[in-house]
């Protein structure tokens, strides 16, 4: 008798499993995919969409269509809680879904700094759909007057968002906005000085200000307050601080890593629930901490597919090897990128062209199964 596989999220780590969904159905298993939207947006191309390099259609995958086309069930909802002992997921709608094997690719989110409910013109960089709303709102505001846009966060996300806002607004009628990054105590602190200085050079040459006078303590509509007590008036605020995993695992009492991600072994399997797997930003790999970059989710794809099938069929599991150093390219807007791979570091148009080629190839590969 077939079993029930449930996938939470249609992100990068589930792409191969989604493409091969029919193989589970052919073996007599049921598959249910639960996601907050009929589409999954590729976050690596999100800043480019903000800057209008890409259209929304170019960076999204038709999750519902792909699932239903292969005989699976798609539920547009969010997982709110996991009842691990009962092997049941409680959804935001109040519905419940039971499972035999479950896999999480639930992503991560940007903490909202205890924002008031009525805060206006404050947008987080995730989910990616928010970037579309932010794009329209920024264009609406800059058409009226000169505005100041603040980006909270000092990592790659803030750099890419700042560069692509510059691209979005540089040819609009009226005065260009002032763009300010509030980077805490140090900009791009996770990276070597030569990387951060190259990115900083590109941004500051465009008039983008990078503030390293301390962390933002609080956010209100139209204003941020730094830890020093200094305030800054802003017309539009982006939250681009470091992302954290979905809190669902900690809330369910499951074993988690220090960041709250589902703690998984070398098989991408929960260390205390053998029927539970995961990939991408929402897990914590027990053997070694992994950076929250899409390359690991892509590398996890085939292993996760194999192990989900193996768990359903009672076959041996396959180990995940994170691999060595990875290519990192930042899209800073204006057709300019910064590329880093081991000892190689370069900036300019060629870096962006390489990123654009890789990203479009990745999307076309999975959009082809639609």
PLM features: what roles do these ranges have?
Residues 1-72, 160-191:
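Beta1-alpha1 glycine-rich phosphate/pyrophosphate-binding loop at the start
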Residues 1-4, 69-150, 238:
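FAD-binding core/adjacent interface of flavoenzyme oxidoreductases
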Residues 8, 98-109, 216, 233-243, ...:
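Short hydrophobic core segments
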Residues 74-77, 81, 169-266:
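A Rossmann-like FAD-binding core segment of flavoenzymes
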Residues 120-145, 231-299, 306-307:
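FAD-site-proximal beta/loop scaffold in flavoenzymes
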Residues 134-176:
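Rossmann-like NAD(P)H-binding beta-loop-alpha module
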Residues 170, 295-323, 329:
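Internal hydrophobic alpha-helix adjacent to the cofactor/substrate pocket in enzyme cavities
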């Amino acid at each position: 008798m077939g079993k029930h596989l449930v996938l939470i999220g249609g992100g990068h780590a589930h792409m191969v499993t989604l493409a091969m969904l029919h193989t589970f159905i052919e073996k007599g298993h049921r598959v249910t995919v639960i996601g907050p939207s009929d589409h999954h947006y590729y976050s690596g191309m999100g800043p480019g969409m903000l800057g209008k390099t890409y259209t929304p259609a170019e960076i999204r995958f038709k999750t519902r269509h792909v699932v239903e086309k292969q005989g699976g069930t798609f539920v547009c909802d969010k997982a709110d809680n996991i009842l691990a002992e009962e092997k049941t997921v409680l959804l935001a709608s109040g519905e419940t879904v039971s499972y035999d094997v479950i896999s999480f690719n639930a992503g991560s989110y940007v903490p909202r700094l205890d924002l008031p409910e009525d805060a206006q013109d404050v947008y987080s960089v995730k989910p990616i759909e928010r970037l579309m709303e932010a794009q329209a709102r920024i264009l609406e505001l800059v058409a009226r007057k000169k505005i100041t846009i603040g980006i909270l966060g000092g990592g790659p996300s803030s750099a890419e968002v700042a560069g692509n806002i510059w691209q979005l607004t540089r040819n609009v009628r009226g005065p260009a906005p002032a763009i300010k990054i509030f980077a805490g105590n140090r900009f791009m602190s996770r990276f070597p000085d030569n990387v951060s200085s190259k990115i900083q050079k590109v941004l500051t040459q465009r008039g983008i200000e990078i503030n390293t006078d301390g962390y933002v303590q609080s956010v209100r509509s139209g204003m941020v307050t730094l830890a020093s007590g200094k305030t800054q008036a802003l017309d539009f605020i982006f939250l681009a601080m470091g992302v954290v995993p979905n809190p669902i695992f900690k809330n369910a009492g499951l074993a988690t890593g220090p960041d709250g991600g589902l703690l998984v072994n070398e098989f991408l399997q929960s260390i205390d629930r053998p029927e539970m797997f995961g990939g991408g930003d929402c897990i914590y790999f027990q053997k070694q901490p992994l950076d929250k970059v899409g390359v690991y989710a892509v590398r996890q794809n085939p292993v996760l597919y194999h192990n989900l099938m193996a768990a359903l069929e009672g076959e041996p599991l396959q180990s995940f090897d994170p691999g060595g150093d990875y290519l990192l390219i930042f899209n800073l807007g204006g057709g300019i990128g910064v590329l880093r791979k081991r000892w190689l570091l370069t900036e300019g148009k060629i870096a962006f062209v390489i990123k654009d080629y890789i990203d479009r190839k990745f999307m076309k590969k999975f959009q082809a199964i639609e």
